[in-house]
Amino acid sequence: MGKEKWCYINSGQCSPAFNMALDECLLNWQSEKKMPPTIRFYEWEVPTLTVGYFQRVEKDINMDVVNEKKYGFVRRQTGGRGVLHDKELTYSVIVSEDHPNMPKTVTEAYRVISQGLLDGFKALGLEAYYAVPKTEADRENLKNPRSGVCFDAPSWYEIVVEGRKIAGSAQTRQKGVILQHGSIPLEIDLDELYDLFLFPNERVKERMKSMFSSKAVAINELTDRTFTIEQLIKAFEVGFEKGLDVELVPYELTEEQLHEVQTLAKEKYESNEWNYKK
């Protein structure tokens, strides 16, 4: 028997609303058994701040700066904290909860899916490994984030290199389907990132910023080589095929599917009601 075939979509650069709408549509189509499991890579037309499903914008985000910089802004359907998507490859994995290779628990499914990321980083020549909270205190810290910034600390089974988080991921389960998506940054501009978040005062902001450098890292900070998005795509194609033991088959959306995504993008992900919901 050959390997199981999964769909592979490389969307390229899209608008913030389109990116989130396509992930949701892929989840819906998976639930309706209209598509096999799917791996998707994408980028962003403009630098974009995404916030987690439960995040309170007025508490965490400096929207004046987001608007002043003309950045994109959209709320994800996954949890977690704020992510600035810029100079990165974003990935999503959409697979049924009852897939024979998918564990029932969120953390174990995270581990299985993230094996594709781990093998992708290894294909780039990076010594990546899983972060697993070692103590009860570490586990408690996962429940009580210190700031609204996503890369602030590793969570269960996130990928680290030299002790620093190198990929931020979030997962949701809806309609019997797992959607995991995340950010693989080539570079991180700390000043740009921290300007987008609200802090009690400048001193706290500077302290959080300096702590961040010891906890998170981007690919091009770790190597003398300067990788491109194209090289990342090739490496993570290989990584997901190896890590999940599948064959990726390129897929293009039909006109009907594209229309469905565009409609959802406009009606939901471009709406203030969704993006600024309390």
From Swiss-Prot:
Q: Entry's HAMAP family?
A: LipM (MF_02118)
Name the domain of life this protein comes from.
Answer: Bacteria
- Native organism taxonomy: Bacteria, Bacillati, Bacillota, Bacilli, Bacillales
* Keywords for the protein's UniProt record, in alphabetical order: Acyltransferase, Transferase
> Can you name one GO molecular function term for this protein?
lipoyl(octanoyl) transferase activity
EC number of this enzyme: 2.3.1.181
Under catalytic activity, the entry for this protein gives: octanoyl-[ACP] + L-lysyl-[protein] = N(6)-octanoyl-L-lysyl-[protein] + holo-[ACP] + H(+)
Its biological purpose: Catalyzes the transfer of endogenously produced octanoic acid from octanoyl-acyl-carrier-protein onto the lipoyl domain of GcvH, an intermediate carrier during protein lipoylation.
The organism of origin for this protein: Bacillus cereus (strain ATCC 14579 / DSM 31 / CCUG 7414 / JCM 2152 / NBRC 15305 / NCIMB 9373 / NCTC 2599 / NRRL B-3711)
What are the residue positions of the site described as Lowers pKa of active site Cys?
Answer: K165
Q: Which residues form the BPL/LPL catalytic domain?
A: 33-248
Active-site residues from the entry: C150 (acyl-thioester intermediate)
Additional facts recorded? In the reaction, the free carboxyl group of octanoic acid is attached via an amide linkage to the epsilon-amino group of a specific lysine residue of lipoyl domains of lipoate-dependent enzymes. The reaction proceeds via an octanoyl-thioester enzyme intermediate.
Assembly, per entry:
Monomer.
Indicate what this protein is called per its UniProt record.
Answer: Octanoyltransferase LipM
Q: What family does the Swiss-Prot or TrEMBL record give for this protein?
A: Belongs to the octanoyltransferase LipM family.
The family database entries (PANTHER family) matched by this protein are listed as:
OCTANOYL-[GCVH]:PROTEIN N-OCTANOYLTRANSFERASE, OCTANOYLTRANSFERASE LIPM-RELATED
